[in-house]
Amino acid sequence: MNLTEDYMVFEDVAIHFSQEEWGILNDVQRHLHSDVMLENFALLSSVGCWHGAKDEEAPSKQCVSVGVSQVTTLKPALSTQKAQPCETCSSLLKDILHLAEHDGTHPKRTAKLYLHQKEHLREKLTRSDEGRPSFVNDSVHLAKRNLTCMQGGKDFTGDSDLQQQALHSGWKPHRDTHGVEAFQSGQNNYSCTQCGKDFCHQHTLFEHQKIHTEERPYECSECGKLFRYNSDLIKHQRNHTGERPYKCSECGKAFSLKYNVVQHQKIHTGERPYECSECGKAFLRKSHLLQHQRIHTRPRPYVCSECGKAFLTQAHLVGHQKIHTGERPYGCNECGKYFMYSSALIRHQKVHTGERPFYCCECGKFFMDSCTLIIHQRVHTGEKPYECNECGKFFRYRSTLIRHQKVHTGEKPYECSECGKFFMDTSTLIIHQRVHTGEKPYECNKCGKFFRYCFTLNRHQRVHSGERPYECSECGKFFVDSCTLKSHQRVHTGERPFECSICGKSFRCRSTLDTHQRIHTGERPYECSECGKFFRHNSNHIRHRRNHFGERSFECTECGRVFSQNSHLIRHQKVHTRERTYKCSKCGKFFMDSSTLISHERVHTGEKPYECSECGKVFRYNSSLIKHRRIHTGERPYQCSECGRVFNQNSHLIQHQKVHTR
């Protein structure tokens, strides 16, 4: 190899900082930088890679002493001007840098031997009674490539890798308090008198001692908060400035701390580096692992006498027992509502004050508390940190995981005292009980309408705003909520995941299955307060009540026809627009709505799902079954206004009325 063409210069290993970056470093980091620069230069000189020209300034005047171009304020602190003797030829050099350059003139001193000798030199500083270590063939005039250490008996060459050097006296790569790796002796020279901890550098000891003295010299000019290190102050100030210099290369999300972006990127890579030694479960963050390990390690001595559930603390047990006793000691002075926990009351009171101080920087939404904001942000990041150990499914919320796990166990410990139904969790039980109590705690601030469920209110409010944020990727239709979109998408996929355990019929929606099962059970939960008639569906109940009050509020703007239900008006308007979006896959016919398409498909399948309980006859359509049952009941609901004659079908009445008009 031609050394004149391939040798390394000091600039190849020099570490430079800009003026701005140098200002950010604290004293410890600056001194450490100087140590590393001096050692790098000494290494280069020792292997003959530094070729300083006469008119070229020494590194001490360029960048070693400070590390920033045109900044030399720390030069005197490095003590590089003291005369130094050469251990090989006893020459006296001006300073340590000239000594390092001079050492390069001794060709036998390879980089490995230099490091090895440096180790013994450090040992000599701590063991004054020992003699100076010597090397075989340690002569200026001998240029052998193989050099042997008398103290360790180890051979060295100039061609092997520096990083593979293993020193017998205890040298090891060491990472100091600020994370810069350097070679350090196994013995530390500076000890803390408070805790006995050892350090290799005096300035590192000084920084450590701030922990004991509680010295915090760095103050935030915005809020006055004090910090031990300048780097901590810089991180804190980003809270005031909103600066987020660390950006995720996958999704573009920005973070104020590098640690946060590293943790966030594990979501994209799927990395879960923290594994539980007990059960093998892996986690994204160490805090999640520590929290999980309490399941294995911490005892649960407090057992509920009602259900046998065990808790870590008595406070948790007392809070849990309120579920069984129904105790709600915390009352809202605005609306009189009571809560089991004070935290629930505090959260509820923000409903009255309208306070939402926590802001999502992704979508601009405001939230009542930081926990809700953090949980909401998982919608944007896609993070699902909770995993089911039975099926491996991941969940965004811990409560959803707990609820899901009961699917595997079949556990339904919460019973409704009114109807005897069992539920998986208390929240579902409380929501169900509103059916019996009639409670509707959620009010629309636009029209004053009350709702039983929060999600129903949110859905209703989109009627006022016109918002339909959920779009179908197949047909481009927009929907007010994700559930409706998912149900709609099953029209395209043909998926029917909800199956009736009685007759095996499958449905697209869970609510449709629940309604269908009332055919088998005979349940009719909706009663008309006017005539006492019961109905299987709430929609039929509402439509029936309009007959009592003559209410017809939905008018067609094309022909003036009035309808009692908005859905009927929408269906009717398709007569004018001739819109038929639903196509039969068998014969290619188009229909105005999905229900008509489903009814039509029975022509091809031969399905007749509606059976008469009296005679067992089956029908394709529910309307046909209703007409047929009037034969058994004798019901004739259609009366002629002219002669008073009654009929069991509307078509028969219309046919009869022609007699009077002739």
From Swiss-Prot:
Disulfide bond sites: none
Residue intervals of the KRAB domain: 8-101
A Pfam family hit: KRAB
Single GO MF annotation: zinc ion binding
Keyword vocabulary terms for this entry: DNA-binding, Metal-binding, Nucleus, Repeat, Transcription, Transcription regulation, Zinc, Zinc-finger
Gene Ontology BP terms: regulation of transcription by RNA polymerase II
ZnF bounds (C2H2-type): 190-212, 218-240, 246-268, 274-296, 302-324, 358-380, 386-408, 414-436, 442-464, 470-492, 498-520, 526-548, 554-576, 582-604, 610-632, 638-660
Main location: nucleus
Location of this chain's protein in the cell: Nucleus
GO cellular component: nucleus
Function (record text): May be involved in transcriptional regulation.
Protein family membership: Belongs to the krueppel C2H2-type zinc-finger protein family.
Name of the featured protein: Zinc finger protein 17
The organism of origin for this protein: Homo sapiens
